[in-house]
Structures are given as C-alpha cells and as structure tokens.
UniProtKB/Swiss-Prot annotation:
CDD domains: RING-HC_RNF141. May be involved in spermatogenesis. The lineage of its organism: Eukaryota, Metazoa, Chordata, Craniata, Vertebrata. GO terms for cellular component: membrane. It is a lipid-anchor. The gene is Rnf141. It comes from Mus musculus (Mouse). This is RING finger protein 141.
Amino acid sequence: MGQQISDQTQLVINKLPEKVAKHVTLVRESGSLTYEEFLGRVAELNDVTAKVAAGQEKHLLFEVQPGSDSSAFWKVVVRVVCTKINKSSGIVEASRIMNLYQFIQLYKDITSQAAGVLAQSSTSEEPDENPSSVTSCQASLWMGRVKQLTDEEECCICMDGRADLILPCAHSFCQKCIDKWSDRHRNCPICRLQMTGANESWVVSDAPTEDDMANYILNMADEAGQPHRP
C-alpha cells in the first residue's frame, strides 16, 4: 500500500513543470533525511570537493554551524557554513551560510557534477592529467553557486516571485503569497511550524550589509588560527 502511494506521488511529480517538480522532490527529501544522513552528506561534500579541486590553490570547507543542530527541530534551524579557503595562506576568502533546503540543492549539484569530472579523469588517455585541470578554480565556481542559492531566494509557494519574507523556520515567501495564506493560517505553509504571535510570525528578511559580511569573514579567519603571510 505504501509503495503504491509512493508510486502515485512520483507519477504526479513527473507531470509537474520541471522547476516545481524539483522543488517538491527537494522538500520530500529534506523531510525524510535523518540527522546521521545529513552529517554524512556534509562529510561527503568535503571529500568530493577535495578530490575534484586537488592541486588547485583554493578549496571549500563545509561545516555545521555550532549550536544550530542542537534542537529537536534541527531541520528548520540547522545551518551549514561553506567557506572558501586559500590553501597556501589559510586565509578565508569567502563564506556563506545555508539552510537545509539550500544545502541539499548544493549537494545534488556538486555530487552530480563531480561524478562527471572524476569519470572523465578516470577514462582519460593521459593518466597523469590532473582532474582539477578541467576548471581553473573549481572552488570559486562552486562558491558562486552557493552565492546564487543564498542570494536569489524564491518564494516557496509560487516558485516565481522573489522572497521578501522569511519565517523563523527559514522558509521564505513573496508578500503576495504569504498574505493570502496568513489570512486563515498561523503556521508555515511548508513545514507547518506553528507561529506563536503576530509579532513573531512574519519576519522581514534583510540581506547582510557589506560590513556585516566583512566582519563575519574576518571572524572566520581569526577562528581558523592561521595567520596571513604576505
């Protein structure tokens, strides 16, 4: 019976527009993801990106933000920090924070791309060819994807309008969609997290300023404990 329902659900998803189907699949996957599987994916991304970017000047480091996964509702509050680091100096060049939904998107993008790159390298007629030569700086390209995911947040309902409101559970929506929903409901349309009051329910999402980002990156560099050697 369960398998039949699952097959029917997949059939419906297959008939949806590609963009909406991808969103539904990601939401379903994040809902069934266990904490151990999540930690495994963070470790896997570190391994995969290290292999593909071997021999390059920069690399990415994925870490769960300390304290963000301690709640019983870790899926709505957990944050993954993606940091681009210069290997020779240890200096943090860029840093971004992702929620679980954004992380799963990135995980799928990177593992899919990396599989192709590593397969191409293994079948190359020149075995000495470095897989990292496929791109000049793979870490920078991936960091650009992280920036796109965290900057261009779309409404979780219509998948069209730019999100300008974010709930405490980190799901974001455009003003038009959330106005219609909040007229009758006091919970999140995606995860159903209950909102306690009008003042706490709908929080305007403000992008960090350049000063905020600069201070954050400097703090990350200090915590890395590796001084810059010009």
